[in-house]
């Protein structure tokens, strides 16, 4: 059923076609409408014509680099939130990006789940949130507090590592939806992670032992030949 609520629109800009396609898939899977551009000039045209809710922008691009794009947008009084992506991690580079008008600066390589969280944070500041960004998500006795990065079962905190929580957060935001191993690898471990690894299965096992301890109800389900889903039995 059409609820009449549109998803936030994100413009993704990167001159690497593989990276661009991966980021587009990941953001779409996370509940955003996504448009793309392969260089700074195209990004500037797109941003001016379509007015996205947020922009994810690589720094190093041909024609017009990312800092120049941000500077041009701000000169036109366009205050769209911008998250800059860069392999440059020095303080001077970060300061240059932020002083040009960027709202956030994310150093490559990064985990896709972190980018999604940063985009959602930028959108919250403008009052636009993705449909999947509930503050606390409940599945049976499990409560997942995404902003606070806390998980509770029957009101008791569950001690999770950073990666375990990242995986749980993605599953919670897509509860009742079966996600493939490839989708989880992309969302949690990043687009450059080896696709033939069994790391997803290993971390699903870790989560099961912690979330379903003491004969608790089954929450994490394996759908044979497809992937994994978070839901009550």
Swiss-Prot record:
Keywords of the record, alphabetical order, are: Cytoplasm, DNA-binding, Phosphoprotein, Transcription, Transcription regulation, Two-component regulatory system
Indicate whether Magnesium appears among the record's keywords.
no
DNA-binding annotation, residue ranges on this chain: 134-232
Name all Response regulatory domain ranges. 9-123
Please list the GO terms describing molecular function: phosphorelay response regulator activity; transcription cis-regulatory region binding
Chief place of localization: cytoplasm
Q: Cite a single GO BP annotation.
A: regulation of DNA-templated transcription
Per its UniProt record, what Pfam families does this chain match?
Response_reg (PF00072), Trans_reg_C (PF00486)
- InterPro entries, alphabetically? CheY-like_superfamily, OmpR/PhoB-type_DNA-bd, Sig_transdc_resp-reg_receiver, WalR-like, WH-like_DNA-bd_sf
Subcellular localization(s) per the UniProt record: Cytoplasm
Is this entry keyworded Transcription regulation?
yes
| Record PTM | Phosphorylated by PrrB at Asp-58.
Give the domain of life. Bacteria
Q: Which of the residues bear the PTM 4-aspartylphosphate?
A: 58
Q: Where are the transmembrane segments?
A: none
Question: What Gene Ontology cellular component terms go with this record?
Answer: cytosol; protein-DNA complex
Q: Disulfide pairs?
A: none
Instruction: Describe its function.
Output: Member of the two-component regulatory system PrrB/PrrA that is involved specifically in early intracellular multiplication of Mycobacterium and is essential for its viability. Upon phosphorylation by PrrB, functions as a transcription regulator by direct binding to promoter regions of target genes to positively regulate their expression. Autoregulates its own expression.
What's this protein's name? Transcriptional regulatory protein PrrA
């Amino acid at each position: 059923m059409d609820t009449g609520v549109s998803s936030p629109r994100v413009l993704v800009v990167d001159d690497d076609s593989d990276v661009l396609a991966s980021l587009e898939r990941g953001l779409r899977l996370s509940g955003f409408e996504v448009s793309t551009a392969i260089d700074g000039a195209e990004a500037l045209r797109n941003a001016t014509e379509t007015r996205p809710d947020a922009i994810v922008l690589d720094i190093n691009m041909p024609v017009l680099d990312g800092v120049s794009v941000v500077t041009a947008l701000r000169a036109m009084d366009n205050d769209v939130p911008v998250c800059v992506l860069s392999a440059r991690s020095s303080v001077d580079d970060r300061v240059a990006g932020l002083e040009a008008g960027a709202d956030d600066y994310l150093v490559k390589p990064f985990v896709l789940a972190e980018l999604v969280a940063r985009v959602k944070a930028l959108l919250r500041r403008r009052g636009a949130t993705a449909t999947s960004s509930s503050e606390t998500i409940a599945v049976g006795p499990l409560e997942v507090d995404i902003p606070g990065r806390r998980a509770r079962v029957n009101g008791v905190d569950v001690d999770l590592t950073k990666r375990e929580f990242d995986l749980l957060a993605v599953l919670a935001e897509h509860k009742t939806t079966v996600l493939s191993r490839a989708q989880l690898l992309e969302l949690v471990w990043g687009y450059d992670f080896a696709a033939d690894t069994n790391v997803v299965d290993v971390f699903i096992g870790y989560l099961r032992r912690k979330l379903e301890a003491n004969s608790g109800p089954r929450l994490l389900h394996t759908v044979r030949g497809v992937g994994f889903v978070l839901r009550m039995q």
